[in-house]
Amino acid sequence: MTKVVVCALYKFVSLPHFESIRAPLLAMMEQAEIKGTLLLASEGINGTVAGTQEAIEALLLWLNSQNGLDNIVHKLSFDDEMPFYRTKVKLKNEIVTMGVEGIDPLKVVGTYVKPQDWNALISDPDVILVDTRNDYEVQIGTFKNAVNPVTETFREFPEYVKQNLDPAKHKKVAMFCTGGIRCEKSTAYLKEQGFDEVYHLEGGILKYLEEVKAEESLWEGECFVFDNRVAVNHDLKKGQYDQCNACRMPITEAEKQSPAYVQGVSCPHCIDKISDEQRKRFVERERQVNLAKARNEAHIGSDVNQVIEARREKKEAQRRLAAEKNNAKKSQVL
């Protein structure tokens, strides 16, 4: 069986005319039968795609021929099945959304630390180690003694820093994420906030798992990935987790035995959070999936990730509105 090559890539680079790249890039991906999503913004490119080895090599060559997109940071892994259903190239305001204006990793960023040097750094008792990923990612694996900010989205990270980190107290801060891109912005943000010694794992967790032997590793658990593999183990192979198709949370085999788990409809993480309308929609979607399987057809279904992201953005907007009202009340008192 031919292995599917999964390629995670990103590059921060000024792309003032990024909109013009979308059409030819999408056409190239479709012609090569590459699946997955790439994001384009004025600050660069980011995404994960999959295809044959020849197709991925062709994509990297194509990107290398485009002005500014040469030498893109990328990491390869392999799967027995295609982990994506669609081919997308999206235009965005940011290639990784922090929601803070003026943060530019091209101007200021933390110190890159090679995977081979990472263990020594995070073993330093003076270093505070922060996992910049979302809580559901951290739950299934992280580095030993890492701090979990318990965020739902990367947008919440600046508030975590504001409430929990102090440049006068925390002299050395080390951060990490899946592939390195979130740390480009998180370290840039901390530098802007006055933190001096700020470090991040070059290439992210995936590069560390690739280059550091398991017996020498300080990684504990599995690494969440944003595709149908759900998580990968230290060998970068599909791990033990499945994913709830309703809320996209990673779930164990034990959780799938729970009465709250109904395939495609609910799990212990979301059973009390989804509405009756959502439940009906998920039941119908699962019925369509099963019908497609019976006909030996692929069923793409609705983009649940968009639903989840919309829900999180709504909650974030509500939090911002509440904070603005609270600040307004304080101003009136003063």
From Swiss-Prot:
The keyword Thylakoid belongs to this UniProt entry's keyword annotation: no
InterPro entries listed in its UniProt record: Rhodanese-like_dom, Rhodanese-like_dom_sf, TrhO, TRHO_N
Keyword set includes tRNA processing: yes
Domain Rhodanese: residue ranges: 123-217
Keywords: Oxidoreductase, tRNA processing
Biological-process GO terms, alphabetical: tRNA modification
Any one GO MF annotation of this record: oxidoreductase activity, acting on paired donors, with incorporation or reduction of molecular oxygen
Enzymatic class: oxidoreductase
Main function: Catalyzes oxygen-dependent 5-hydroxyuridine (ho5U) modification at position 34 in tRNAs.
UniProt family annotation: Belongs to the TrhO family.
HAMAP family named in the record: TrhO (MF_00469)
Stated name of the protein: tRNA uridine(34) hydroxylase
